[in-house]
From Swiss-Prot:
Belongs to the synaptotagmin family. Ca(2+) 1 binds at residues 166, 172, 225, 227. The modification Phosphoserine is found at residues 52, 61, 119, 122. The chain crosses the membrane at residues 17-37. Ca(2+) 2 binds at residues 166, 225, 227, 233. The C2 domains bind Ca(2+) and membranes. Binding to membranes involves Ca(2+)-dependent phospholipid binding. Compared to other members of the family, the C2 domains of SYT7 dock and insert into cellular membranes in response to intracellular Ca(2+) concentrations that are lower than those required for other synaptotagmins. The two C2 domains bind independently to planar membranes, without interdomain cooperativity. Moreover, SYT7 C2 domains insert more deeply into membranes compared to other synaptotagmins. The keyword Lipoprotein applies. Disruption phenotype: No visible phenotype. Mice were born at the expected Mendelian ratio and do not show gross abnormalities and/or obvious neurological defects. Mice have a normal life span and are fertile, although reproductive capacity is declining faster with age. Embryonic fibroblasts from Syt7 deficient mice are less susceptible to Trypanosoma cruzi invasion, and display impaired lysosomal exocytosis and resealing after wounding. This is Synaptotagmin-7. GO terms for biological process: calcium ion regulated lysosome exocytosis; calcium ion-regulated exocytosis of neurotransmitter; calcium-dependent activation of synaptic vesicle fusion; phagocytosis; phagosome-lysosome fusion; plasma membrane repair; regulation of bone remodeling; regulation of calcium ion-dependent exocytosis. The gene is Syt7. One of its GO terms (cellular component) is synaptic vesicle membrane. It comes from Mus musculus (Mouse). Its cofactor is Ca(2+).
Length: 403
């Protein structure tokens, strides 16, 4: 007898129904797993994007055209740049990325407990103020107040012995001027290209600024290295509470630059050794270990590895890198890399060492860098010279990682 399949018992599912149910179950499981993974990635990338947005910058119009520039201040006055030197190449504001707000914010908080008496000095008779761990150079400037015109005058003159921030062994310095606690408005000098002893001689006027409000402000100067393609690199800073300065006449200061309070904390240190063999025309770089590295991951740790670049006349020649140490802020590497460097090319050679945080799901993060050459910072130059003075001997030294 013919029996219609659709008339079969309702309690007995067919094979096709079971197959479709299995496919739907597997699809739902895969979808849930992918959604969870995407949510985790979004949280991690969102945190970095949020940090990148916490910046401040005031675009300046008309830079380099010779006209006066004014900014309306909360106190009711205005700031005017009256730089007398025309024809100098300005830095293009559209090419500059904004810097983090934390540098100025941290300084405002710290100044409440650091209102120290400051005395004016001259280039000839003022000694360096204390012994800093690293020489960041010094800056000369003057400040005074005109009571008849209610105008505060700040003149940025020059700087000396600035550290090299570029891998070419030089810097492109400029100065930002703030009257704290106002952090939104700033004035800037021109950029001095490839100059570690720049002369600016630029004058800035804060007009219509009552004296009783001036003495409540803190003059803050920040020296930075201009970078057209990335964030400007802070070199150092100086701050003066104006209630501690005799403003009845122009006072000239020579002040040592102090490390900028970037709010990011220490990036850690790296121990490495250099061994120069003049007969073999080679340098062996041994990456030994690091300590107190900055945590870059959400879990409060990092997956560090080290890249070593050999540069010659600002051009990349060769790259080496270590293995990655998982979840370790005090990794031990003990990896050596040999680079062929003829003696006659040694002065134009730079070794760039970058400690990175490995990330599987996004771009690897830079923890910190070290530039080794004849023209780097004081600590780096010392290591380089010690290497030359002691051929065929490994010379080890700790280096502070920098941004």
């Amino acid at each position: 007898m013919y029996r219609d399949p659709e008339a079969a018992s309702p309690g007995a599912p067919t094979r096709d129904v079971l197959l479709v149910s299995a496919i739907i179950t597997v699809s739902l499981s895969v979808t849930i797993v992918l959604c969870g993974l995407c949510h985790w990635c979004q949280r991690k990338l969102g945190k970095r994007y949020k940090n990148s947005l916490e910046t401040v910058g005031t675009p300046d119009s008309g830079r380099g055209r010779g006209e006066k520039k004014a900014i309306k201040l909360p106190a009711g006055g205005k700031a005017v740049n009256t730089a007398p030197v025309p024809g100098q190449t300005p830095h293009d504001e559209s090419d500059r990325r904004t810097e983090t707000r934390s540098s100025v914010s941290d300084l405002v908080n710290s100044l409440t407990s650091e209102m120290l008496m400051l005395s004016p000095g001259s280039e000839e008779d003022e000694a360096h103020e204390g012994c800093s761990r690293e020489n960041l150079g010094r800056i000369q400037f003057s400040v005074g107040y005109n009571f008849q015109e209610s105008t505060l005058t700040v003149k940025v003159m020059k700087a000396q012995e600035l550290p090299a921030k570029d891998f070419s062994g030089t810097s492109d310095p400029f100065v930002k001027i703030y009257l704290l606690p106002d952090k939104k408005h700033k004035l800037e000098t021109k950029v001095k290209r490839k100059n570690l002893n720049p002369h600016w001689n630029e004058t800035f006027l804060f007009e219509g600024f009552p004296y009783e409000k001036v003495v409540q402000r803190v003059l803050y100067l920040q020296v930075l290295d201009y970078d057209r393609f990335s964030r400007n690199d802070p070199i150092g800073e100086v701050s003066i509470p104006l209630n501690k300065v005799d403003l009845t006449q122009m006072q000239t200061f020579w002040k040592d630059l102090k490390p900028c309070s970037d709010g990011s904390g220490s990036r850690g240190e790296l121990l490495l050794s250099l061994c120069y063999n003049p007969s073999a025309n080679s340098i062996i770089v041994n990456i030994i270990k690091a300590r107190n590295l900055k945590a870059m991951d959400i879990g409060g740790t990092s997956d560090p590895y080290v890249k070593v670049w050999l540069m010659y006349k600002d051009k990349r020649v060769e790259k080496k890198k270590t293995v990655t140490k998982k979840r370790n802020l005090n990794p031990i590497f003990n990896e050596s890399f040999a680079f062929d460097i003829p003696t006659e090319k040694l002065r134009e050679t730079t070794i760039i060492i970058t400690v990175m945080d490995k990330d599987k799901l996004s771009r690897n993060d830079v923890i910190g860098k070290i530039y080794l050459s004849w023209k780097s910072g004081p600590g780096e130059v010392k290591h380089w010279k010690d290497m030359i003075a002691r051929p065929r001997q490994p010379v080890a030294q700790w280096h502070q990682l920098k941004a």
